[in-house]
């Protein structure tokens, strides 16, 4: 009874258990788990700048699980980092053929396309990702779409996407700051001021938000407030 319990536990921890001809149990490792281990190693090497080891581990991950989307995305990311853009594009396309409704692939391919200056196509894939019913990184895709729209010179579209980002994740500070900046540039001072004040209420005084408030009050002609925020920023800089 105890032996059976041990074998059952091994099966749950490591994968499927089969019995060899001599009657001994053989544990087969799960290919996804094996791929994940190699992905972790590969991305770690990539972050360290060891491209040779990164590629080796990411290619092994793909051999363990050729259709596993995280292995596909990881090797595509590697190709991007080393400038093999055709290989990256082909890897993304293959992944999309196999997983056409995977929001992570759609989002990452959109990011890749935006980096190549293919803004319209990138926007299409960001929105496809957002539309997937079981994709939960919607705020990240809206934010990516917003910054891509900025790169394309589509300020109004960017503002819309930043607003949608905040709707889905009110604590996404980068989008709040960027939207406030765009509102200041558009003369929408009240809207921008509210957003920046909310940041201070939630997180305390922050350098980026103070810098924007100084810019805002200068543009609005509020000299006393401009000086107030400048003094707060100066004090913060002295402490740091």
Regions found by a protein language model. Name each.
Residues 71, 105, 139-141, 175, ...:
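TPR alpha-solenoid repeat register
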């Amino acid at each position: 009874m105890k032996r059976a319990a041990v074998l059952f536990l091994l099966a749950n921890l490591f994968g499927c258990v089969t019995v060899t001809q001599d009657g001994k149990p053989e544990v087969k490792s799960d290919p996804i788990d094996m791929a994940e281990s190699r992905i972790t190693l590969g991305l770690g090497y990539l972050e360290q700048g060891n491209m040779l080891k990164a590629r080796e581990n990411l290619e092994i991950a793909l051999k363990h699980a050729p259709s596993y989307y995280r292995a596909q995305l990881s090797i595509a990311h590697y190709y991007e980092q080393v400038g093999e853009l055709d290989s990256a594009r082909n890897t993304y396309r293959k992944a999309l053929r196999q997983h056409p409704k995977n929001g992570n692939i759609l989002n990452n391919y959109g990011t890749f396309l935006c980096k190549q200056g293919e803004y319209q196509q990138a926007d299409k894939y960001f929105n496809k990702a957002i539309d997937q019913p079981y994709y939960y990184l919607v705020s990240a895709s809206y934010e990516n779409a917003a910054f891509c729209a900025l790169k394309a010179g589509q300020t109004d579209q960017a503002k819309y996407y930043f607003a949608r980002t905040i709707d889905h994740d009110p604590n996404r500070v980068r989008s709040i700051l960027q939207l406030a900046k765009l509102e200041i540039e558009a003369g929408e001072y009240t809207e921008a001021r509210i957003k920046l004040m909310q940041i201070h209420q939630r997180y305390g005084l922050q350098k980026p938000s103070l810098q924007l408030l100084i810019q805002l009050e200068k543009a609005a002609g509020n000299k006393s407030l401009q000086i107030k925020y400048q003094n707060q920023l100066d004090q913060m800089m002295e402490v740091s």
